[in-house]
Amino acid sequence: MSDANLDSSKKNFLEGEVDDEESVILTLVPVKDDANMEQMEPSVSSTSDVKLEKPKKYNPGHLLQTNEQFTAPQKARCKIPALPLPTILPPINKVCRDTLRDWCQQLGLSTNGKKIEVYLRLHRHAYPEQRQDMPEMSQETRLQRCSRKRKAVTKRARLQRSYEMNERAEETNTVEVITSAPGAMLASWARIAARAVQPKALNSCSIPVSVEAFLMQASGVRWCVVHGRLLSADTKGWVRLQFHAGQAWVPTTHRRMISLFLLPACIFPSPGIEDNMLCPDCAKRNKKMMKRLMTVEK
């Protein structure tokens, strides 16, 4: 029986010892593991960082940017103090727009609008007795004048362009016919022949009342169309050719004139000399030719 009690006491002691050991293991082992992990993690991370990181190159731009980041706030803190209100308002061309706005803010006025509007608002509220010193050549006035000048120049250029285009169109619409001397002579003969076959009534017409057909004798010379040269003007019978219905007419009496059948010379006089006259001999020859043509027709 004593042996049985001894065995039971040993068994209880061993169970208690086992319980104590298990309790010790359960309480101490996790604490040691956590401490070891905490000690190992920084060492591992530090070694990995050292292995993975590469040496950075020197970048002066990065340093300048960093310096600007540090210096920019310091500059932003330095604010220029507003100028106090002057006793006399300076002219608009001697003060900037920001200064005018600061003065308006000091007086509680609106700062909206152009520079000239802000200036006039400040003058009206703070300096009503002072005479307005508004120079003509302010910035706004210069801009307005420049715009007006630009518009005037544009309008003038447009008118000049349209005028040149009209002149060019007129030049294109004008047809200039240049005929040689033989060609002109043949054309004149053709016209004369066409008139010759017409009746006398068509080769004769009345002279207008206000026309000076017969010329008086004078000293000097006159240009004869048929001869193509200057002849003496002191002879009687010089006539001035008349142009009617697209052809030339020779006065025969003070009331009648007949067609020109003589061929004009292809020679032109000097400038300033009248070239629409017929000498007495040519006037007589033209009259005789008219009679012959009418006789042949009969």
From Swiss-Prot:
This is Developmental pluripotency-associated protein 2. InterPro entries: Dppa2/4 (IPR039590), Dppa2/4_C_dom (IPR025891), Dppa2/4_central_dom (IPR025892), SAP_dom (IPR003034). It is found in: Nucleus. Interacts with DPPA4. Pfam families: DCR, Dppa2_A. The lineage of its organism: Eukaryota, Metazoa, Chordata, Craniata, Vertebrata. GO terms for cellular component: nucleoplasm; nucleus. Expressed in embryonic stem cells. No expression is seen in 5 months embryo, mesenchymal stem cells, embryonic fibrocytes and adult tissues. Residues 92-126 form the SAP domain. Residues 36-61 are annotated as: Disordered. Keywords: Nucleus, Transcription, Transcription regulation. Binds to target gene promoters, including NKX2-5 and SYCE1, but not GATA4, and may be involved in the maintenance of the active epigenetic status of these genes. One of its GO terms (molecular function) is chromatin binding.
